[in-house]
Design a protein with these regions (language model features):
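N-terminal Rossmann-like dinucleotide-binding module
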Residues: 1-48
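Beta-loop-alpha module in the N-terminal Rossmann-like domain of NAD(P)-dependent dehydrogenases
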Residues: 17, 51-110
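Hydrophobic residues in well-ordered beta-strands that form the structural core
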Residues: 55, 94, 119-121, 243
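C-terminal helix-rich "cap/oligomerization" subdomain common to oxidoreductases
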Residues: 68-70, 293-343
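Mid-domain beta-loop-alpha active-site segment that forms a flexible
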Residues: 122-129, 157-188, 202-203, 290, ...
């Protein structure tokens, strides 16, 4: 089966989608059209990728009959565009976050169920080879009991992001990965945010997540740091994993502690610095792997790895982080105290 794919949105991320789709074997994937309201941007995409272009995505869908539509538009348009596509019974890949609000996401899930269409959400870090290898190691028991997750997703302010802050735009990546590697849901959150550079939205988030299996996650996310860092550490009884999303590297720092029957000595030890191991990772482009998964899901008639339900779960946690921030005590009042919110 050859899957016909159309893309809505030809901005910075949309161009990445078009590039990846063009790299597929045409016997498996056919790029049938791109829709973009800004005509100079549309013409550039048409010229570069030799694809039919439309200023009206509805007309594109009517004329190209796609099996899958990638929704790569600003977040505030996700709901409107995806709802229109799903109502036609067409599968969608929605760039993260799934929508701005839980109500919008629930509406998408409902129409998808009614029309028999699939929703995939572009939490692309799930397909990062470093995350894939990390999950494989965890399934093998390399870490033992998991204690703690710490995500650092920091870097300069991107002017192209105008309609959302770091919690929805950046932290959603790490929330999704944490749910995946912890293999548990979040039950409590606490957060603090600040707005320093962005004109309307928060550009700094510090958040705590407590999972149902008692693992604690830390989110350190901002658009204020003059260098780009994308890292996750996972600490457990046998050591600590460190993954670098940008370089797709995975390191394991072994806890060299050797159990002993001497209770007094045991109370003084428990963790000891050991060997650092660099794991072998086959590097690949996460977006391409994401498309491979979504296309295979269509052909095999199964759910994609990152489903609409996953997107909704992440959005619920994002909302809880926002509510936690709002319940804190602000400037001019008494020092802020921790507010724990049940998810």
């Amino acid at each position: 089966m050859r899957v016909r794919v159309a893309v809505i949105g030809a901005g910075s991320m949309g161009m990445n989608h078009l590039r990846v789709l063009k790299d597929f074997d045409e016997e498996r994937v056919q790029l049938v059209g791109v829709a973009e309201t800004h005509e100079p941007t549309l013409k550039h995409a048409m010229s570069r990728f030799h694809v039919a272009g439309y200023t009206d995505y509805r007309l594109m869908i009517e004329q190209t009959h796609p099996d899958l539509v990638a929704v790569v538009v600003p977040t505030h348009l996700h709901s409107e565009v995806a709802l229109n596509v799903l109502d036609r019974g067409i599968n969608v890949l929605i760039e993260k976050p799934i929508t701005r609000t839980i109500e919008e996401a629930l509406a998408l899930l409902q129409i998808a169920s009614i029309r028999g269409a699939r929703i995939a959400v572009g939490h692309v870090e799930r397909f990062n080879p470093a995350v894939v290898e990390l999950k494989r190691q965890l399934l093998y028991g390399a870490l033992g009991q998991m204690f703690h997750l710490h995500a650092r997703r920091i870097g300069p302010f991107p002017p192209r992001i105008r309609d959302v802050g770091v919690t929805l735009d950046l932290a959603s990546h790490d929330i999704d990965v944490m749910r995946y590697v912890a293999d548990a849901e979040v039950e409590h959150v606490y957060a603090q945010t600040q707005r320093r550079v962005h004109s309307t939205c928060e550009d700094l988030l510090l958040g705590l997540l407590r999972f149902t299996n008692d693992v604690i996650g830390v989110l350190d996310v901002n658009w204020l740091t003059p260098t780009k860092i994308r890292e996750l550490t996972i600490t457990g009884e046998k050591g600590m994993f460190l993954i670098n999303y940008l370089t797709q590297e995975v390191y394991f720092y072994v806890n060299d502690y050797t159990p002993t029957t001497w209770d007094t000595l045991r109370s003084l030890t428990g963790v000891s610095e050991g060997t650092m191991i660099r794991l072998k990772v086959q590097k690949a482009e996460p977006l391409q792997l994401e498309y491979q998964d979504v296309i295979t899901a269509i052909v095999d008639d199964r759910l994609p790895t990152v489903s609409g339900e996953d997107g909704l779960a992440v959005l619920r946690i994002v909302q809880q982080l926002a509510e936690s921030t709002q319940q804190g005590v602000y400037a001019g009042q008494q020092p802020s105290v921790a507010v724990e919110v049940e998810v």
